[in-house]
A protein has these predicted regions:
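A conserved structural motif in NAD(P)-dependent oxidoreductases
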Residues: 197-208
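Active-site loop-to-helix junction immediately N-terminal to the catalytic Tyr of the SDR YXXXK motif
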Residues: 136-144, 156
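Residue(s) in the substrate-gating loop at a strand-loop-helix junction
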Residues: 130
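Catalytic Tyr-X3-Lys loop
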Residues: 82, 89-109, 126, 143, ...
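Short, small/polar-rich loop/turn modules that mediate ligand/substrate recognition or access, typified
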Residues: 162-166, 223-225
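Short C-terminal tail/terminal secondary-structure segment
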Residues: 135, 213, 224-238
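N-terminal Rossmann NAD(P)H-binding glycine-rich loop of SDR-like oxidoreductase domains
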Residues: 11, 19
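Alpha-helical segment proximal to the catalytic Tyr-Lys
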Residues: 116, 158-163
Protein backbone atom coordinates (compact mmCIF):
# COMPACT_ATOMS: atom_id res chain seq x y z
CA UNK A 1 0.00 0.00 0.00
CA UNK A 2 1.22 3.53 -0.88
CA UNK A 3 1.60 4.97 2.64
CA UNK A 4 3.44 8.27 3.02
CA UNK A 5 4.07 11.28 5.22
CA UNK A 6 3.16 14.59 3.60
CA UNK A 7 5.64 17.39 4.25
CA UNK A 8 4.53 20.95 3.47
CA UNK A 9 7.30 23.54 3.27
CA UNK A 10 9.66 20.69 2.41
CA UNK A 11 12.43 22.94 1.09
CA UNK A 12 12.72 25.10 4.21
CA UNK A 13 15.15 24.56 7.08
CA UNK A 14 12.80 22.48 9.23
CA UNK A 15 11.01 20.79 6.35
CA UNK A 16 14.18 19.66 4.58
CA UNK A 17 15.69 18.44 7.86
CA UNK A 18 12.52 16.44 8.53
CA UNK A 19 12.64 14.95 5.04
CA UNK A 20 16.23 13.88 5.65
CA UNK A 21 15.44 12.34 9.04
CA UNK A 22 12.45 10.41 7.69
CA UNK A 23 14.55 9.21 4.77
CA UNK A 24 17.17 7.95 7.21
CA UNK A 25 14.44 5.86 8.84
CA UNK A 26 13.30 4.56 5.43
CA UNK A 27 9.93 6.33 5.63
CA UNK A 28 8.16 7.29 2.40
CA UNK A 29 7.26 10.95 1.90
CA UNK A 30 5.48 13.25 -0.52
CA UNK A 31 7.05 16.71 -0.63
CA UNK A 32 5.20 19.98 -1.10
CA UNK A 33 6.66 23.47 -1.58
CA UNK A 34 6.27 26.47 -3.87
CA UNK A 35 9.83 26.77 -5.25
CA UNK A 36 9.98 24.47 -8.27
CA UNK A 37 13.77 24.28 -8.62
CA UNK A 38 14.44 23.65 -4.94
CA UNK A 39 11.64 21.09 -4.75
CA UNK A 40 12.87 19.19 -7.79
CA UNK A 41 16.40 19.10 -6.37
CA UNK A 42 15.16 17.81 -3.02
CA UNK A 43 12.97 15.22 -4.69
CA UNK A 44 15.88 14.06 -6.83
CA UNK A 45 18.12 13.71 -3.77
CA UNK A 46 15.73 11.45 -1.88
CA UNK A 47 13.65 9.90 -4.64
CA UNK A 48 10.38 11.21 -3.23
CA UNK A 49 7.26 12.29 -5.12
CA UNK A 50 6.32 15.96 -4.92
CA UNK A 51 3.74 18.65 -5.69
CA UNK A 52 4.45 22.30 -6.42
CA UNK A 53 2.01 24.41 -4.47
CA UNK A 54 1.59 27.92 -3.06
CA UNK A 55 -0.65 27.61 -0.03
CA UNK A 56 -1.59 31.30 -0.18
CA UNK A 57 -3.72 30.38 -3.18
CA UNK A 58 -6.61 28.60 -1.51
CA UNK A 59 -7.53 26.82 -4.74
CA UNK A 60 -4.45 24.64 -4.20
CA UNK A 61 -6.40 22.02 -2.25
CA UNK A 62 -8.36 20.73 -5.25
CA UNK A 63 -5.16 19.94 -7.14
CA UNK A 64 -3.56 18.37 -4.08
CA UNK A 65 -6.50 16.03 -3.62
CA UNK A 66 -5.87 14.81 -7.17
CA UNK A 67 -2.10 14.52 -6.64
CA UNK A 68 -2.50 12.56 -3.41
CA UNK A 69 -5.47 10.45 -4.45
CA UNK A 70 -3.49 7.20 -4.44
CA UNK A 71 -1.64 7.91 -1.19
CA UNK A 72 -2.60 6.64 2.25
CA UNK A 73 -1.54 9.48 4.54
CA UNK A 74 0.25 8.50 7.74
CA UNK A 75 0.85 12.06 8.82
CA UNK A 76 1.12 15.69 7.76
CA UNK A 77 3.77 18.18 8.86
CA UNK A 78 2.91 21.78 7.99
CA UNK A 79 6.41 23.27 8.04
CA UNK A 80 5.30 26.48 6.34
CA UNK A 81 6.13 29.78 7.96
CA UNK A 82 7.13 33.40 7.66
CA UNK A 83 8.90 36.07 9.67
CA UNK A 84 6.65 39.12 9.74
CA UNK A 85 8.45 41.58 11.98
CA UNK A 86 7.62 45.28 11.91
CA UNK A 87 6.41 48.01 14.28
CA UNK A 88 2.68 47.84 14.91
CA UNK A 89 2.21 51.38 13.56
CA UNK A 90 3.64 50.21 10.22
CA UNK A 91 1.34 47.22 9.85
CA UNK A 92 -1.61 47.07 7.49
CA UNK A 93 -4.68 44.88 7.51
CA UNK A 94 -3.30 42.92 4.55
CA UNK A 95 -0.25 41.92 6.64
CA UNK A 96 -2.43 40.24 9.26
CA UNK A 97 -4.71 38.67 6.67
CA UNK A 98 -1.83 37.21 4.65
CA UNK A 99 -0.14 35.80 7.76
CA UNK A 100 -3.42 34.30 8.99
CA UNK A 101 -4.13 32.68 5.64
CA UNK A 102 -0.60 31.26 5.42
CA UNK A 103 -0.45 29.94 8.97
CA UNK A 104 -4.05 29.07 9.81
CA UNK A 105 -6.58 29.08 6.98
CA UNK A 106 -4.50 27.02 4.56
CA UNK A 107 -3.81 24.28 7.08
CA UNK A 108 -7.48 24.06 8.02
CA UNK A 109 -8.28 23.47 4.36
CA UNK A 110 -5.62 20.77 4.18
CA UNK A 111 -6.84 18.94 7.27
CA UNK A 112 -10.46 19.07 6.08
CA UNK A 113 -9.52 17.76 2.64
CA UNK A 114 -7.58 14.80 4.03
CA UNK A 115 -9.46 14.17 7.27
CA UNK A 116 -10.95 10.84 6.20
CA UNK A 117 -7.61 9.65 4.84
CA UNK A 118 -5.86 10.55 8.09
CA UNK A 119 -8.66 8.97 10.12
CA UNK A 120 -8.45 5.56 8.50
CA UNK A 121 -4.67 5.57 9.00
CA UNK A 122 -4.74 6.86 12.61
CA UNK A 123 -2.68 9.74 11.30
CA UNK A 124 -0.77 12.52 13.01
CA UNK A 125 -0.66 16.22 12.16
CA UNK A 126 2.21 18.45 13.29
CA UNK A 127 1.69 22.22 13.21
CA UNK A 128 4.12 25.00 14.03
CA UNK A 129 3.77 28.01 16.31
CA UNK A 130 6.46 30.23 17.83
CA UNK A 131 7.77 31.17 21.25
CA UNK A 132 6.36 34.64 20.45
CA UNK A 133 2.79 33.32 20.66
CA UNK A 134 3.05 33.30 24.46
CA UNK A 135 5.87 35.75 25.17
CA UNK A 136 5.55 39.39 24.25
CA UNK A 137 8.19 40.60 21.81
CA UNK A 138 8.35 44.04 20.24
CA UNK A 139 7.39 44.21 16.53
CA UNK A 140 5.88 40.71 16.53
CA UNK A 141 2.15 41.56 16.46
CA UNK A 142 1.53 39.98 13.03
CA UNK A 143 3.22 36.64 13.51
CA UNK A 144 2.38 36.35 17.23
CA UNK A 145 -1.34 36.69 16.59
CA UNK A 146 -1.34 34.20 13.69
CA UNK A 147 0.68 31.62 15.60
CA UNK A 148 -1.45 32.04 18.73
CA UNK A 149 -4.38 31.09 16.52
CA UNK A 150 -2.51 27.95 15.46
CA UNK A 151 -2.14 26.97 19.12
CA UNK A 152 -5.87 27.41 19.65
CA UNK A 153 -6.56 25.39 16.51
CA UNK A 154 -4.27 22.63 17.76
CA UNK A 155 -6.12 22.01 21.01
CA UNK A 156 -9.55 22.41 19.42
CA UNK A 157 -8.88 19.95 16.59
CA UNK A 158 -7.12 17.54 18.94
CA UNK A 159 -10.38 17.30 20.86
CA UNK A 160 -12.65 17.19 17.82
CA UNK A 161 -10.67 14.73 15.68
CA UNK A 162 -9.75 12.26 18.44
CA UNK A 163 -9.40 9.33 18.77
CA UNK A 164 -8.23 8.60 15.22
CA UNK A 165 -6.21 11.72 14.40
CA UNK A 166 -3.58 13.30 16.62
CA UNK A 167 -2.84 17.03 16.40
CA UNK A 168 0.23 18.55 18.05
CA UNK A 169 2.15 21.78 17.69
CA UNK A 170 5.81 22.73 18.00
CA UNK A 171 6.69 26.24 19.18
CA UNK A 172 10.30 27.07 18.25
CA UNK A 173 12.35 30.12 18.97
CA UNK A 174 14.32 31.79 16.19
CA UNK A 175 15.89 29.17 13.95
CA UNK A 176 18.60 29.52 11.31
CA UNK A 177 16.95 29.43 7.90
CA UNK A 178 16.78 31.22 4.57
CA UNK A 179 13.96 33.46 5.76
CA UNK A 180 15.77 34.43 8.97
CA UNK A 181 19.20 35.10 7.46
CA UNK A 182 18.62 38.86 7.43
CA UNK A 183 18.67 38.80 11.23
CA UNK A 184 22.14 37.25 11.30
CA UNK A 185 23.94 39.75 9.09
CA UNK A 186 26.75 40.41 11.56
CA UNK A 187 28.41 38.71 14.50
CA UNK A 188 27.06 41.23 17.00
CA UNK A 189 23.47 40.37 16.06
CA UNK A 190 24.22 36.66 16.29
CA UNK A 191 25.78 37.04 19.73
CA UNK A 192 22.86 39.10 21.01
CA UNK A 193 20.28 36.61 19.76
CA UNK A 194 22.20 33.60 21.05
CA UNK A 195 22.49 35.17 24.48
CA UNK A 196 18.71 35.53 24.68
CA UNK A 197 18.60 31.73 25.00
CA UNK A 198 19.85 29.85 28.07
CA UNK A 199 21.46 27.25 25.79
CA UNK A 200 23.44 30.07 24.11
CA UNK A 201 23.03 29.04 20.51
CA UNK A 202 20.68 29.49 17.61
CA UNK A 203 18.21 26.78 16.75
CA UNK A 204 18.65 24.72 13.61
CA UNK A 205 16.15 22.97 11.40
CA UNK A 206 17.25 19.57 12.65
CA UNK A 207 16.42 20.56 16.25
CA UNK A 208 12.81 21.19 15.31
CA UNK A 209 12.58 18.31 12.85
CA UNK A 210 13.61 15.76 15.47
CA UNK A 211 10.52 16.51 17.54
CA UNK A 212 8.30 16.63 14.45
CA UNK A 213 9.52 13.16 13.46
CA UNK A 214 8.77 11.92 17.00
CA UNK A 215 5.24 13.34 16.94
CA UNK A 216 4.51 11.89 13.50
CA UNK A 217 5.47 8.40 14.57
CA UNK A 218 2.64 5.96 15.40
CA UNK A 219 4.81 4.75 18.28
CA UNK A 220 3.86 7.96 20.10
CA UNK A 221 0.13 7.49 19.77
CA UNK A 222 -0.83 8.75 23.24
CA UNK A 223 0.22 12.35 22.61
CA UNK A 224 -2.26 14.88 21.25
CA UNK A 225 -3.26 18.49 21.84
CA UNK A 226 0.22 19.50 22.99
CA UNK A 227 2.11 22.73 22.34
CA UNK A 228 5.77 21.85 22.81
CA UNK A 229 8.56 24.41 22.93
CA UNK A 230 11.85 23.78 21.13
CA UNK A 231 13.40 27.10 21.96
CA UNK A 232 16.71 26.78 23.77
CA UNK A 233 14.91 27.49 27.03
CA UNK A 234 13.73 30.93 26.00
CA UNK A 235 10.06 30.42 26.83
CA UNK A 236 10.53 29.17 30.37
CA UNK A 237 13.94 29.89 31.84
CA UNK A 238 15.31 32.88 29.92
Amino acid sequence: MNKKYIIFGATGATGSALVHQLYEEKKACHLIAKNKDELENLSSTYGYSYSICNVLNLNFVDQLVKDLNSIEILGIAYCVGSIDIKPFKSTQAKDFISSYVLNVVSVTEIIKAFQENLKRNNGSVVLFSTVAAKRGFVNHSIISSAKAAIEGLTVSLAAELAPNIRINCIAPSLTKSKISNFLFDNKKNIDVIQNMHPLKRLGEGKDIASLAKFLLSPENSWITGQIIGVDGGRSSVA
